């Protein structure tokens, strides 16, 4: 380990930590980096930046989120911005803060219900946009200004899965609601919808016209991304909280027991293997430079060829 730091002495941070569930905790969001600094946000509302040597660059408090499970929306970085999605029981906001000093670059109020999903970047019609999901809508915001470009009311309930983009469509889903495919634009429209297999937490992923969904009750499904037709389904013994990842022509989905289910990127069900991590896992793996990084409940793993 190169370094570790405690986040303390943040102006405005609550003296007492807010009440959250044990499943979520105070540090559920995944950290983000611009390659020069790393950024983290916590259930206290503290957001902080460190350089690669562990030196604190800046920190601020965004206000304690009114969130009965705990804040879990991860940060994303693009250019000079850190994007923060901050939906709470008292409404929400989406904002961009500067990577160098943490100052607000833009901020927009969101008149919606609470969510636990993360913002997603997508290039649509030659413009970088931020996609968000919440109850009751999927929305797109201009990355440069934060302006809302469009929204579609199509979700409900406690939204944890983020949006996905591929094949010219925006996908959103939530358990006890529905899976939708939206054609984005000034007048967005729902192209198709399906309510058979829906995620509670895991975000869908699309590639080559195939859309993959992992459910909290153990079903993993593949759909035609253009029509919504189901190609296949697969039943695991445990549910999926981690989002599926596509890499090297394969689909990787780790279940809550720590079994990594590896599928061929194909409209026919082809299970390549089911290796065992050895402990429970609910975080989405990261893939880089031929290696897989997995955060288990107790350990951090790096897996690759020697």
Segments the model singles out, each with a brief description of its role:
Residues 1-306:
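Noncatalytic, solvent-exposed loop/strand surfaces
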């Amino acid at each position: 380990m190169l370094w570790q730091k405690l986040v303390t002495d943040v102006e405005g941070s609550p003296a007492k930590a807010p009440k959250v569930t044990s499943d979520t905790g105070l540090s559920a969001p995944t950290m983000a980096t611009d390659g020069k600094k790393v950024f983290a946000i916590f259930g206290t509302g503290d957001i902080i930046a460190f350089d690669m040597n562990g030196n604190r660059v800046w920190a601020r408090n965004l206000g304690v989120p009114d969130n009965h499970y705990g804040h879990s929306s991860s940060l994303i970085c693009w250019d000079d911005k850190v994007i923060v999605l901050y939906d709470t029981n008292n409404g929400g906001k989406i904002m961009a803060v500067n990577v160098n000093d943490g100052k607000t670059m833009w901020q927009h109020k969101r008149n919606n219900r609470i969510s636990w999903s993360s913002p997603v970047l997508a290039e649509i019609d030659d413009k970088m946009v931020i996609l968000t999901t919440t109850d009751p809508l999927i929305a797109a915001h201009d990355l440069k200004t934060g302006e809302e470009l469009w929204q579609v009311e199509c979700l409900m309930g406690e939204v944890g899965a983020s949006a996905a983009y591929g094949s010219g469509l925006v996908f959103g889903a939530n358990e006890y609601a529905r899976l939708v495919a939206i054609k984005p634009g000034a007048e967005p429209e729902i192209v198709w919808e399906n309510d058979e297999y829906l995620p509670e937490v895991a975000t869908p992923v699309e590639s080559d016209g195939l859309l993959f969904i992992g459910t909290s009750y153990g079903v993993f499904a593949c759909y035609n991304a253009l029509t919504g037709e189901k190609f296949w389904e697969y039943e695991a013994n445990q549910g999926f909280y981690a989002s599926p990842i596509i890499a090297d022509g394969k689909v990787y989905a780790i279940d809550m027991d720590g079994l990594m289910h590896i599928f061929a990127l194909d409209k026919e069900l082809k299970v390549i293997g089911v290796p065992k991590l050895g402990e429970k896992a609910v975080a989405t793996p990261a893939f880089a430079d031929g290696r897989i990084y997995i955060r288990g409940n107790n350990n951090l793993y790096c897996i690759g060829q020697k």
